[in-house]
A protein has these predicted regions:
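Domain-level detector for secreted/extracellular nuclease and nuclease-toxin modules, and
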Residues: 3-4, 10-464
Length: 464
C-alpha cells in the first residue's frame, strides 16, 4: 500500500486502514465536502420482476475484535454513477445499508453486505468464479479497507456492478390518503425474493386532479454525502398517467397556451408573466434528487409522481436553499428525520393590469375542470422523534407582492424568528422572484392542510 507526504487527505486514511492501523485513532473526514446539488429538472425505467433468481449463500465468520471495518466513501469509492450499480442492502432486509454520519458505508470486518441486481452481475459471474449468471443477489464479505471476498476471490468494492441498470417501479397500493381522496403509491425496487420491496419513498397522489399532496421519506445525517454526478434523467410516467402526455403538459409551449386561454389574450402578450429564462414552470422535484444518497435511490426521484409545476426562479432560488439547509441541519445535529414534502393550493395568474387573477392549471378534463394545478405553496415538514418538528414553506408565485403574500399565502403563524437554525431564512422585499419563505408549527399547519396524516397533529414541539 502506497503512502505519500500529503497525510491530511482522506485518501491516505484509506491506505492506512488497508494495513490495519487502528480505525478509532485515525478515522476522520478532513477534506470532504457535502455536494451542492444542481438544479433538478427531468424517463424512468420500467420495472419488471426477474424470474429464476439465484441467491449466493450468506458467509458467516467470526470478526476479529481489533480489525477495523470496511469503509466505503459514498463520494469516492462507489462505482462511477454512469455505470449500473447494484442495490446496497442490509442482508435479508428491505433496507438500504446507509452510510454513517461521516458519509462512509461501514461494514464490520468479516460481515457481509447484500448486493442486488435485477439482471446479471458483471465481473463476478462465470465458470472461473463458480457464480451463475442467473445470480441476482450476492453477499460479499468485508476483508479490509475497500476489499471484499466473494466465493474465495477478492474484489474491490467498485468492481461490483450489474450488466444493466437496476429497474425500479412505482406501485399503487391499496391504501388511501388525504382523507380518502387520494391514493398511496410506493416507489422503489422489487427485490427478487418474494415480498421484499426496497422503498425509497411513498407518495400521496390524487389521480383525478393530477396533484401529488406529499412525498414521504427519511433523511439521515449521511444524506449530505450523496453520490455526486449522477446523470439527470427525463421524468417518467413509470407506467402510469396513460391518458396524458405529461412531457407536453409541462412544456413551455403548453404553459403559454394555457395562460393565454386563461386570461383571454394572445401568448405574445404574456411576456410579463412567462419567459424562457426563469419565468417558466419546471418539473419541480418534491423529494430532491440530492436528498437520496445512492445513484439507484436518486434515479427513483425522476417520476411525475414526485413532481409539480414549480416556477424556475423559485426552484433554483429559495427552494434550493431550503433543501440544502435541511440536509445540513440533519447532518449537524446527527439525527435522522422523517420528511414530508408537498404542495398546497393553486396559484392564481394575474392579467397584465392585475385586475384579473385566476387559478392556473396546465391541463383540463372533458368538462373543463382544471388538472395539474400550479401549486400556491411548496412545503417541507421535518419531524424528529415523536413530537418535535417544523414546517418550512415557500411561495410558488414570482409575481406576488408582499401584500398579496401576507394576506393570501401565509396560512399559519410564521415562527421562523423563534428557531435559531433558521437564521438564514430571509426574504428580500424588492426581489421576490426567487421565492418567499416562512415557517410554521406542524400541529398548526395540518389544521389548514388536512391532506396530511393525522398523526402529525401530535407534533407539538418546535424543532429548535
Amino acid at each position: 500500500t502506497t503512502t505519500t507526504t500529503t497525510s491530511t487527505t482522506k485518501h491516505l486514511l484509506h491506505r492506512i486502514l488497508n494495513i490495519y492501523i487502528l480505525f478509532n485513532i485515525f478515522y476522520g473526514v478532513a477534506g470532504r465536502e457535502a455536494v451542492t446539488p444542481s438544479d433538478d429538472v427531468e424517463s424512468l425505467l420500467k420495472c419488471e420482476t426477474e424470474a429464476g433468481v439465484v441467491v449466493m449463500p450468506m458467509v458467516y465468520t467470526t470478526a476479529r475484535n481489533n480489525a477495523p471495518p470496511c469503509l466505503i466513501d459514498t463520494q469516492r469509492d462507489l462505482p462511477k454513477p454512469n455505470l449500473p450499480q447494484p442495490l446496497y442492502l442490509r442482508p435479508n432486509s428491505s433496507e438500504y445499508w446507509l452510510p454513517n454520519d461521516e458519509g462512509y458505508l461501514e461494514v464490520p470486518h468479516g460481515s457481509s453486505i447484500e448486493l442486488v441486481c435485477t439482471g446479471a452481475f458483471a465481473n463476478v459471474t462465470g465458470t472461473s468464479t463458480g457464480i451463475s449468471q442467473r445470480t441476482r443477489i450476492i453477499r460479499p464479505r468485508c476483508i479490509q479497507g475497500t476489499t471484499f471476498s466473494l466465493n474465495g476471490d477478492k474484489y474491490e468494492f467498485q468492481q461490483f456492478l450489474c450488466t444493466k441498470s437496476v429497474k425500479y417501479t412505482v406501485e399503487r397500493t391499496a391504501q388511501t390518503c388525504a382523507n380518502h381522496t387520494a391514493q398511496l403509491y410506493r416507489v422503489g425496487y422489487n427485490v427478487t425474493t418474494k415480498g421484499r420491496f426496497v422503498e425509497t419513498m411513498h407518495i400521496c397522489h390524487d389521480d383525478d386532479e393530477l396533484r401529488t399532496h406529499y412525498v414521504r421519506y427519511t433523511l439521515v445525517p449521511g444524506s449530505v454525502y450523496f453520490q455526486p454526478n449522477v446523470k439527470r434523467l427525463s421524468f417518467s410516467k413509470a407506467q402510469h398517467f396513460s391518458a396524458y402526455n405529461m412531457h407536453q403538459l409541462y412544456s413551455q409551449k403548453n404553459q403559454r397556451l394555457k395562460a393565454a386561454q386563461l386570461l383571454n389574450t394572445e401568448p405574445e402578450a404574456l411576456a410579463y408573466a412567462l419567459d424562457a429564462k426563469s419565468l417558466y414552470l419546471s418539473r419541480g422535484h418534491l423529494a430532491a434528487k440530492a436528498d437520496m444518497i445512492y445513484a439507484t435511490q436518486q434515479r427513483t426521484t425522476y417520476t411525475f409522481f414526485n413532481a409539480a409545476p414549480q416556477w424556475q426562479s423559485f426552484n433554483g432560488g429559495q427552494w434550493a436553499t431550503v433543501e440544502n439547509k435541511v440536509r445540513a441541519f440533519v447532518a449537524k445535529i446527527k439525527r435522522s428525520a422523517s420528511c414530508f414534502t408537498g404542495t398546497v393550493g393553486t396559484m392564481h395568474l394575474k392579467s397584465a393590469d392585475a385586475n384579473v387573477r385566476l387559478p392556473f392549471y396546465l391541463a383540463a378534463d372533458a368538462n373543463n375542470n382544471g388538472l395539474l394545478p400550479v401549486p400556491a405553496l411548496y412545503y417541507r415538514i421535518i419531524v424528529m422523534g415523536d413530537s418535535a418538528g417544523i414546517v418550512l414553506l415557500g411561495v410558488n408565485d414570482p409575481h406576488a407582492t408582499v401584500s398579496e403574500i401576507l394576506t393570501e399565502y401565509v396560512i399559519c403563524q410564521d415562527v421562523r424568528e423563534q428557531v435559531p437554525w433558521l437564521s438564514w431564512m430571509r426574504n428580500v422585499a424588492g426581489n421576490l422572484k426567487p421565492g418567499y419563505l416562512y415557517a410554521c408549527r406542524v400541529d398548526e399547519f395540518i389544521k389548514v392542510v388536512p391532506a396530511l396524516p393525522v398523526e402529525l397533529g401530535n407534533v407539538t414541539e418546535l424543532l429548535l
